[in-house]
Design a protein with these regions (language model features):
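Helix-breaking motifs and short loop linkers at transmembrane-helix boundaries and internal kinks
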Residues: 46, 78, 99-105, 116, ...
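Conserved MFS/SLC helix-loop-helix module at the cytosolic interface between two early adjacent transmembrane helices
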Residues: 65-104
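Helix-to-loop junctions at the C-terminal end of transmembrane segments
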Residues: 66-79, 268-280, 363
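Paired small-residue
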Residues: 93-96, 104-113, 306-314
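Cytoplasmic helix-loop-helix junction between adjacent transmembrane helices
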Residues: 109-149
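Intracellular juxtamembrane helix-capping segments at the cytosolic ends
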Residues: 120-132, 320-334
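C-terminal transmembrane helical hairpin of 12-TM major facilitator-type secondary transporters
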Residues: 282-326
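A late C-terminal transmembrane helix in Major Facilitator Superfamily
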Residues: 332-368, 375
């Protein structure tokens, strides 16, 4: 009787997972604040808009490179203690940003904050999925990723409003306060996941985590995540100039349009979170195919306001919202370990860099529609990288409902995923 009822209890996502989303909210708000306060930062730091733009790239590179290094350094630390350490590092980065009197000081602040945020994402996702039954991991990831969606939807406008009204320094002080609040909630309500039966030595665990880098299905999962996010950010990075210079919306209306886009990502994230566990690969394929379709429509009809807006909302529904399904695929092809999830996060960040950097390079040559066309190509490549996973029942659907607890929690993977 107990074995029949235990899994049902664990199907609920515990409050601790929602608390982890609060930390993600703080990190994402900080990540995008620089892009929203470029003119104020350029004036305050006595530099130009292009130099402030480089701060966005610096943050992304710090995430991609520094995040895994910081996670690796914290592997022997219990997950909750690791999160509290990261909160402290992230807080230092934002305080330095608030106190910055020149560009070099701000560069240092963004490097510290970027590395901390990526490490936090990886460990938070890892903890979130370890606190629930394997069959609802996608739902748990969606809850954690709600912090990302809400950071874009609410945190970024809040930081821009505060920074615009009271000075850009106040935006970073506000983020610091949010960080402290999230840290207190984590300290109070988040516990370390139960250790796996039999225990694993840290060195052996690290070797196992790194060994997945030789697994073809894991590498394909990394590639598809990079391409999915790259496709989305090829368009998202340039929504503002496209909507104002090509579509013809007023500059004052763009924040409202982006708010609606953010609401679409929130809805999409919730839907994908529900589908990600039982229909992992089909969700990725269908969602990415829709994204390619919406990107195509956006590229063709940017001059028609109603259609451009409709296709933009479509991109919001099926773009970054693939995160829960992407995470479930990565965990099945690899493991739920923090280092694995942080490496995955770094490849997602690589997608952001590819979409925005290559898109920027194409604009002088082919115009503002060119990055969107790039996104279409990346989405098609993503479909090609997702398709081989259809051969694995475990990657498609996970463990069967009648699998034992030991089978569900035994870790990485499936006989159907040969190396």
């Amino acid at each position: 009787l107990s074995t029949a009822t235990a899994p049902a209890v664990k199907k609920a996502v515990p409050p601790a997972v929602y608390v982890l989303a609060a930390g993600v909210f703080a990190m994402v708000t900080s990540e995008f604040t620089v892009a929203g306060l470029m003119p104020q930062l350029a004036e305050g730091l006595v530099t130009g808009i292009p130099q402030i733009g480089y701060l966005v790239t610096i943050f992304a590179v710090a995430m991609a490179v520094g995040g895994p290094l910081l996670t690796f350094a914290l592997l022997k630390v219990p997950p909750k203690s690791a999160l509290m350490t990261i909160f402290a590092i992230f807080l230092v980065g934002n305080v330095i940003a608030a106190l910055a009197t020149g560009y070099p000081m701000m560069v240092l602040a963004r490097i510290i904050s970027g590395a901390a945020s990526q490490a936090f994402f990886g460990i938070a996702v890892s903890m979130g999925v370890q606190l629930v039954d394997e069959r609802v991991r996608g739902r748990a990831v969606a809850v954690v990723m709600n912090g990302l969606m809400l950071g874009t939807l609410l945190g970024l406008p809040l930081a821009i409003f505060v920074g615009g009204r009271f000075g850009w320094q106040t935006a970073f002080w506000t983020i610091s306060a949010i960080t402290l609040g999230a840290a207190v909630l984590t300290l109070a309500f988040v516990s370390n996941p139960a250790a796996p039966a039999g225990g694993v030595e840290p060195a052996a665990s690290t070797r196992s985590d790194l060994a997945v880098l030789r697994e073809p299905q894991f590498l394909l999962a990394l590639a598809s995540s990079t391409l999915i996010i790259g496709a989305t950010f090829s368009a998202f990075s340039f929504f503002t100039p496209i909507l104002t210079e090509v579509t013809g919306f007023s500059v004052s209306l763009v924040p409202v349009l982006l708010l609606v886009y953010g609401a679409a990502t929130l809805v999409g994230n919730l839907v994908v979170g529900r589908l990600a566990d039982k229909h992992t690969i089909s969700t990725l394929l269908f969602g990415t195919a829709l994204n390619a379709l919406f990107l195509t429509g956006f590229a063709l009809f940017t001059g028609v306001p109603s259609l451009a807006l409709a296709f933009m909302l479509g991109i919001g529904l099926v773009g970054v919202t693939m995160n829960p399904a992407m995470a479930v695929r990565i965990q099945r092809a690899g493991s739920t370990a923090p280092l694995v999830n942080t490496i995955h996060g770094s490849f997602i960040t690589l997608g952001v860099i590819i979409g925005s950097a290559v898109g920027s390079a194409l604009i002088p040559l082919h115009g503002l529609r060119a990055p969107v066309v790039l996104g279409i190509g990346l989405a098609v490549l993503a479909i090609a990288a997702i398709s081989p996973a259809l051969a694995s029942p475990y990657l498609r659907r996970g463990a069967p409902d009648d699998a034992s607890e030991g089978e569900r929690e035994s870790g990485p993977v499936p006989p159907a995923c040969p190396s």
